[in-house]
Each structure stands twice: as C-alpha cells, then as structure tokens.
C-alpha cells in the first residue's frame, strides 16, 4: 500500500487519462464542483460535513491543497480525470484503504466525482474499468466499495456492468458515528466487466 504514496501511477485508455491531482487543476475542476446537478452524486459520507460544493476557484484550490496534504499523510489518493479529446479535467477519483471495526474493514473505498454531463452509464463504465483493476493491488484490498444512491440510475447500471453488487451492510462513520447506506461492493475474484475495455498504465 505504501508504493502508491511514493509514486502515483497514471492510467489511460482512448478516451480518458487518470493522473495525480495537481493544484493547477482548479481552473477546470471548479466547473465540476460548482455543478449543482453533479452535487447529489458526490459521496461526502464521514467528511466532516463538507458537501464538496466549491463555487469558486479559490475554494477549489483550498480543497486540492487538502487533497495533496492528505496524500502526503497517506490518507487517500486523488486522481484527476482528463477528457483526452477536450484536454479538460472533468472529475476526480479518490481511493483509500479503510481500516476500522465495522462491516467494511480493510476494503478499498472509491469515490467518483464527475461533471454532470459525464454522469452516464457508458462514461462511468469506461472510467471505472481504468481504476478498479489496479486498486486491489495498489491499496492491498480484496474488496472495493463505492457509494451509489438509489436515484443514480446511470451509475447503478455502470456498476452492475463492472461487476459491483449492492450491499445491505451499513458503513459506520468513524468521524460522526452515523451509519451510511447505499454502498456497492466488488470482490477481486469476481471482477469481470461485461465489456472488453483495455486500460494501460502510463509509464
């Protein structure tokens, strides 16, 4: 698990590039995190009350500084998602290894934040197939969980295609003690996307 905090790999396919988030991403990412149509799909569980709505570039830069600080502290890794055709950041992915005494101990937690126009089954499926396979080894986990609210119909379809299944278990908030629902889970042994999309690690 320590390797990813020493050198963060990038991943890409024909459409998207996932690479370590940078402060300069703020200019593009503010359009993601100020997108009120995207906001309901962000996972802010156990995040000190932050709802990830950043209405200006100043606030966006503050958030990215926190992401970079968290990476240095080995709390989580944040990748920026680049649309290769537009040369534009259209979202981020956060992943970390969760160690706690609840139903989701020693799992990888994956958070996907996207600009609302990319909240489609096809786009999500393409992005998830870049990050899910390497996550098991990078974060030393046998299972990965991600939150998918019941109204996120496009995301639900994409997660099913990747191989995730809805869990009935609740996630205990280590910060607030609240029990969070709507988590989907995938096991390393059953990862088998229904479509054959090839992702390659960028050297």
Regions found by a protein language model. Name each.
Residues 52, 59-80:
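A short helix-loop-beta-strand connector motif used in the catalytic cores of GNAT acetyltransferases and
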Residues 50-58, 118, 122:
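Charge-dense, low-complexity intrinsically disordered segments
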Residues 1-42, 78-203:
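Acyl-donor (CoA/ACP) binding surface of acyl/acetyltransferases
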Residues 16-17, 47-50, 68, 146:
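A general structural-boundary detector
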Residues 39-54:
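A short gly/proline-enriched turn/hairpin at secondary-structure junctions
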Residues 57, 61-64, 125-129:
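Short, well-ordered alpha-helical scaffold segments within catalytic/effector domains
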Residues 52-55, 63-65, 169, 178-180:
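Short, intrinsically disordered/low-complexity patches at protein termini
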